[in-house]
Structures are given as structure tokens and as C-alpha cells.
Amino acid sequence: MKYQQLENLESGWKWKYLVKKHREGELITRYVEASAAQEAVNLLLALENEPVRVNVWIDRHMNPALLNRMKQTIRARRKRHFNAEHQHTRKKSIDLEFMVWQRLAGLAQRRGKTLSETIVQLIEDAEHKEKYATQMTTLKQDLQALLGKK
């Protein structure tokens, strides 16, 4: 395992995940009967500040169909949490209009690169073009100065 598991922190994430799914209308308990399901949900809501007991609740009451999705969500959250500690692994987001994103994605696909690699390549291309334009302007000025002096 690449990232260390932090039980208290992850239990809080699990609690938030389950409460969010419940509020979205998903069945988070294994119970078919509405009263038993509501009782289990009320018990979960009472566990907000008791992260260790959230895992016990999950073992006893959670809908087994939700287990895999929750594990994937927690694994992704753990990765983002640890990557955020270091500047070079921290992810940034930028707002792009859909058409811009679509063109960038198409270019990345044609070049066989990721979006980030494509953006870096575009920046480097622009920098080279700028440098070339500056060199050409300087060369032109030098040439005019040489021809003008004679």
C-alpha cells in the first residue's frame, strides 16, 4: 500500500460519504424494512463525532452493494490527501470553456500525451516562438544598422 491509512480521518470520510449517499436518496443500510433502515441511519447520524464507532456501524448495518464504491472513494480521497502535502504532487484545477477543453483534449489525443503534458508543450512552443521572434527582430535591427552605416 502506497498511502498510510489513518483510521480516525478515514472514518470521518466514511461517515460523510454515507450521510451524503443517504441524503441523495440511496439505500445505505442492508435492511429492506423502512423502520429498521431509518433506525440504523439515525444511529449513524448520532456517530458524527465518534469515528471509531462508524466502522462498527459499517460492519453491522451498511448495504454490501455500497462497500466497493465506498472503498474506491476513500482510496481516492486518501491519495488526494497525501498528494496535497507536497507541492509537486498537489493537483490544481483550472476553469476551461467546454470548446477550449475539447480542442485541448483532441490535441492531446493526437499527440498521444496527457492534458498536462500537452499544456506544457504548448507553453514551451510559445516560449520558443517568442525567443525566435526576439532573435529575428534583433537580427533585423543589426542588419539595418550595418547597411545604414555604409
Curated annotation (Swiss-Prot):
Disulfide bonds: none annotated. One of its GO terms (molecular function) is sequence-specific DNA binding. Keywords: Cell cycle, Cell division, Cytoplasm, DNA-binding. GO terms for biological process: cell division; regulation of DNA-templated transcription. GO terms for cellular component: cytoplasm. Transmembrane segments: none annotated. Required for spatial organization of the terminus region of the chromosome (Ter macrodomain) during the cell cycle. Prevents early segregation of duplicated Ter macrodomains during cell division. Binds specifically to matS, which is a 13 bp signature motif repeated within the Ter macrodomain. Belongs to the MatP family. This is Macrodomain Ter protein.
